Amino acid sequence: RKVVEQLFERNGVLRWDAILAEVQNQNLGETDLETLHAAIEKIPGLVNLGKPAVNPYFTTEENIERENYCIDIVNQTKGVCNDFASDYIPFSEAEDTFDHSAQIEVIDQIVQSKDPFAVFRGVAGAGKTSTLQELCKCLKKGGVINIHVVAPTNSAVDVLRSENFESAQTMAMFLQNKDKLPPKGSYLIIDESGLNSLRQGTEMMKLAMENEYRVLFVGD
């Protein structure tokens, strides 16, 4: 049961063989395969999603509840916020000759959004960091006083701080220090958001609802 809990901390859905393999690995051969197979099937809250029949997908009741919560919140809060009236032109201070039109389009969409939750996806090397830097300038010109950046690991935080995101901190630290949360109405940027667990993402969305945060999930 402990192994399954650990697996689903980082995975929303897993195939049966992946679960069984990890249980076997941590069991170190002390229990035969048939006994392990039967024990896993009896774990409370484990849900068989079916298909393919020979190696079905599994999740947990807790994960389903979290996913449903996140989906419901996103749907219920669409269009409830004001957009950011910013007169800053992204990359107007750039000294390079690079074509920033795609990045500017992304920034415009985010700034003009009336949803509390937004997503920014881009492959490695697509210019996400410079886009976020310009986005922050737009947000500040649009009246946003507090912008906070959150990342999954200490190394990612170090990189962000070196790129002038001085307030960057880890997701774990952010969620643990609830007495030191940013003030209401802050703008949160969740970098490499796909590396966070479903539990962390759900907690972040709950905090956003409680504190009127706007949240941008960034990843590839």
Predicted features along the sequence, with ranges:
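Conserved ATP-binding/catalytic motifs of P-loop helicase motor domains
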Residues: 1-220
